Amino acid sequence: MQVEANSERRVKILGIDRSENSPVLTYMETEDDPNFRNSKLAAAPHTVHMMDSGFLAINRQCLVKGKAILAREPKSSNEHMIDDLPKHAHDQHTLSILRDFIDQLKLHNVYEINFYDPLDSSGKLAVIPMLIALWKCMLASETDICDQEVLKSIMNSVIAKFELQIPCKNAVIDATLSGSREEVHIIAEDGSLENSNGTTEHFNKKHDLVFVKTDLHPEDFTPQMFPSQAKAKLLRDAFNNEEDEDTFPDILVPAYMTAHSKNRVRQEDYTCLEVEFDSQVALEKLMNEHEQVEGFEVQQGGILVALKKDSFFDDELIEKIAIAIATESRQSVSSVSFDLLKLGPGASLVTLANSRRFEPECRVVLQIEVKPVSPGETSSEGISDEHHYEEYDEDDIMEEEEAPSARQDDTYDEDEE
């Protein structure tokens, strides 16, 4: 439903559903399973990006289960049984990528391979964690499989061969392999051999990082990112600044996320999606009204929001965020999901001993109804505040003073090193 810019609407919460699940435990076989000793499970974390220049491994895991079904070298990768891929328009393309990767691993057995949860937070098929989890799974059964450095070379060749659009792929690979319980993985500085990452410990103690997605956000999109060395340095410093309790908020991670987001929606060489711009307007207004919302970054597939620690469990705040987004949207929103992102470990083989170290996935989904406001009605139900849709000008977004990161225009691709 298209909504006129000057209309007022009633946004009603029809239902709110909180859930917590542990996919790793769900797919982990027990010792009572007769196939337990013949099957291996590996996990590789999905990632989210910040300011187009930093990557965090999160608790959402891509899982691969493999079992040797023939103890001989395969004649070709077509002999491997690959199952449980999500149904989408590019099934055969994905299978070709996987089989090309498997060929280069030079396996000595024929396997039955199952993939679980290969979609990232935005709903896109995430090739990097799929390949890394597959490699980790094969490590448990193969005696002379490639090491990590050769793995990176193989992955880069596959990405190049199939012309996959994965911005800053080397930083994504590093985050997936190493995890982010200690570091955010920043794109490498040109010509520098120094560790360019920032520490995540204090950020994690102070903030809830939440990925918000509406039913209007696309899942099949070509990622457009604008990494730069300047933004990379600011982001690294911002993470390190979180360590000092007396640091001014305007040089911490949430502030730089917000400034970057403001700049992104009006960047001349970027075609901003309608849902991105509307979300930007909604979150800016919300930040002015609720101190629990500390910062945000509008992205193509959703919104990365930094809340005060433990605010994710405040149903009233979650409702306010959902209603604000629905109110400012020019298209009618019918659902909003919230995923609590916890810092995830690096890729690993899953065993009974370590399966409990994987954080559960916490999610909230709100069903929403949007209708025109009748005389005497308020514009929202489910919270105490009222929200009205107002006409706005895109140029107004940039009138406020920006943090330094929003003024950087030098771009840098760490994959070109």
From Swiss-Prot:
GO CC entries: nucleus
- Listed GO biological process terms: cell differentiation; dosage compensation by hypoactivation of X chromosome; male sex determination; mRNA alternative trans-splicing
What induces or represses its expression, per the UniProt entry?
A: Down-regulated by at least 4 X-linked genes, termed X-signal elements including fox-1 and sex-1. High levels of xol-1 in males correlate with low sdc-2 expression, preventing dosage compensation. Conversely, low levels of xol-1 in hermaphrodites correlate with high sdc-2 expression and the assembly of the dosage compensation complex on the X chromosome.
* Entry's localization field: Nucleus
Q: Which UniProt keywords apply?
A: Developmental protein, Differentiation, Nucleus
**Acidic residues bias spans:** 391-403
Q: What is its main location?
A: nucleus
Region named Disordered: 373-417
Pfam family for this entry, one: Xol-1_N
Phenotype upon knockout is: Worms are XO-lethal, due to inappropriate activating dosage compensation where only 1 X chromosome is present. In contrast xol-1 overexpression is XX-lethal, deactivating the dosage compensation pathway and elevating the expression of X chromosome genes to lethal levels in hermaphrodites.
What the protein does comes down to: Sex-determining factor that is required for sexual differentiation and X chromosome dosage compensation to promote male development. High expression during gastrulation triggers male development, while low expression at that time triggers hermaphrodite development. Although related to GHMP kinase, its mode of action remains unclear.
The UniProt entry's sequence similarity note says: Belongs to the GHMP kinase family. Xol-1 subfamily.
Q: This protein is called what?
A: XO lethal protein 1
Q: Which organism is it from?
A: Caenorhabditis elegans
Gene that codes for this?
xol-1
